[in-house]
Amino acid sequence: MSNMSQLFDASRFPDDVKVRANGKATVMTLYGSENGSLRLFSLWEGAILSFNRIYTQVWPLAQNEAANILLLNFCRKGRCEVALEDGQFAFLSQGHMAVGTQQAQEEYRYPSGLYEGVELFLDLDMLAHRPYPLFQEGEVSPEGIVEHLHTSRRLYLGPTPACVQTLLDDLWQLRDSEEVGLLKLLSAQLLWKVERQPLETSPTVRYFTSSQVSIARETRNILCADLSQNHTARELADRFQVAET
């Protein structure tokens, strides 16, 4: 049985998250004053494609995340913040991708309250036990992606290559369709491209420690509490006992 068999089980989420079948897709929806949805397509046992449309600042975390899942996350719009197993925070913004097997430790946060993205979930254990014929024929290797991006120890964060972005745009156009065959082909092609693209390092630091994030959030609260008050960098640095930079 796949590690993802319960990954999107509604019983593992708060009551305001519902899961229902919708044609050839499964839709997970967050109801309430703020909302969002994940539209999920099963490509093969152990391979799931998700179209994410989030209109809230916080998306709930499942009670327990599934083990040994390779997650490829591509941001189209907005920004996502997530706490990782190693105590660091990762920030994924428009035009960037994240690839790895690290587990999220807290709710996913979306500061702007708007996020659009595409995700691919690959169960490494299941795909090793029961390989996906399309991956085999197309020479797509999840293990090869892990090795190429060095994600066995750390989440890979970097710009989405232009050729990958083109495929993401094609996939996004099909987000509300039921063209599962085409979704499978485009997903396999996308993975093939990711595995073979030269590594690019973003000039922007995208990892932060929990203390850095706490300081940033508290600083935001101070600045927004009374916009008529001016606070200098020196004042805030002294308050948190850190350098102005």
Predicted regions and their residues:
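Short hydrophobic beta-strand segments that form the core of ligand-binding sensory/regulatory domains
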Residues: 51-53, 71-73, 116-123
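Flexible coil/turn residues that form the inter-helical turn or adjacent wing/linker of helix-turn-helix
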Residues: 229
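Generic structural motif
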Residues: 43, 54-59, 77-79, 123-127, ...
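N-terminal low-complexity or simple alpha-helical regulatory segments
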Residues: 1-67
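Alpha-helical bundle regulatory/interaction domains
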Residues: 83-212, 216, 224, 233, ...
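Glycine- and acidic-residue-biased ligand/ion/polar-headgroup-sensing regions
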Residues: 66-86, 124
